[in-house]
Structures are given as structure tokens and as C-alpha cells.
């Protein structure tokens, strides 16, 4: 387990994307700070400041602003297996009608780690992390399929996690 800064389309798991214009564009210094934290979320502000040309206090202020704006989170990233979650799956969902109410219902479920609206074969893709197969079955069969508007689901159960990283930088 280690800490990383996760700069994402929506650092707030229930909030709107910071890429939809709700936040001003980031300058090169803020992007460099994010990259430093993606490498090590516990990196001292003084070390970041040295790398990006700012004082420790200025880095602290910028990091707080990035957190407050929902541009990034600083989180501990774990291997789900090591903390008791032995079953992960991606679930493709087709919806009748408006996607938002279904996406909102999925977002409220603690087992749903990612909920994305997509173009293609599925309207929504949801990553689910569960304790075991029985838990996964309960989430899909009794909870997801019971959401009004869900027309169909297709599950893609993970057999082996080969890579999990949040090091995409700030391209």
C-alpha cells in the first residue's frame, strides 16, 4: 500500500468533473505539483517546492486549493486482495431512459468504485469491488438490476489484477 495523488476527471467520487469547466485550467506549476504527488503522495512540500521552484508554504497553499477544488485527492492505494476484497468485476449496464438517475443510484453504492457513462455497447460501466462471489452476486442481482431503468447487465469478472496505477501524469 502506498499513497498517491489521484488527479482525475472527478476527484470527488460523487461530484462533477473538474474538466467540465467548473475549475479554471491549471498552470504548469500546479500540473508539476500533481505529478510530484502522483509519484509519492507523502512527498514533503519542501521537496516538491524545490522541484517546482516554489517555497514550502506556496506548495502547501496550492495543494490545499487543488484538494478544495476537487482537482485531486491524496489517497492510500491498496491491492484489494490484501484488504479482504477477493472479487472485482466490471459491469456493463444498458439503461432505458435517462442515464443520470441510474448513475446516481450506482454512485451511492459503496461497492461501486467507478461509475462512467460511455459510448458503445453499454450506457454505463461500473467497477465493483466485493468481498467474495456471494457478495458480487447480491450487488448485481439484487441491487443493480433492481434500479429503475436498468435494462440489462453484463459482468466481466477480474481473474487477476496485472496493473493498478494512477501515474498517468498530467498529459
Placement of each model-derived feature along the sequence:
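A compositional/biophysical signature of low hydrophobicity enriched in polar/charged and small residues
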Residues: 1-171
Amino acid at each position: 500500500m502506498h499513497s498517491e495523488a489521484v488527479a482525475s476527471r472527478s476527484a470527488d467520487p460523487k461530484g462533477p468533473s473538474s474538466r467540465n469547466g467548473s475549475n479554471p485550467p491549471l498552470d504548469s506549476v500546479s500540473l508539476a505539483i500533481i505529478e510530484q504527488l502522483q509519484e509519492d503522495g507523502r512527498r514533503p512540500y519542501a521537496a516538491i517546492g524545490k522541484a517546482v521552484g516554489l517555497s514550502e508554504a506556496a506548495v502547501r497553499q496550492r495543494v490545499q486549493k487543488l484538494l478544495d477544488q476537487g482537482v485531486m485527492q491524496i489517497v492510500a492505494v491498496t491491492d484489494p486482495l490484501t484488504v479482504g476484497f477477493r472479487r472485482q468485476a466490471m459491469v456493463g449496464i444498458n439503461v432505458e431512459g435517462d442515464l443520470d438517475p441510474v448513475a446516481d443510484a450506482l454512485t451511492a453504492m459503496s461497492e461501486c468504485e467507478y461509475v462512467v457513462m460511455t459510448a458503445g455497447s453499454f450506457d454505463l460501466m461500473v467497477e465493483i469491488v466485493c468481498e467474495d462471489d456471494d457478495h458480487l452476486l447480491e450487488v448485481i442481482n439484487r441491487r443493480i438490476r433492481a434500479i429503475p431503468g436498468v435494462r440489462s447487465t453484463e459482468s466481466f469478472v477480474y481473474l487477476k489484477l496485472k496493473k493498478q496505477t494512477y501515474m498517468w501524469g498530467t498529459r
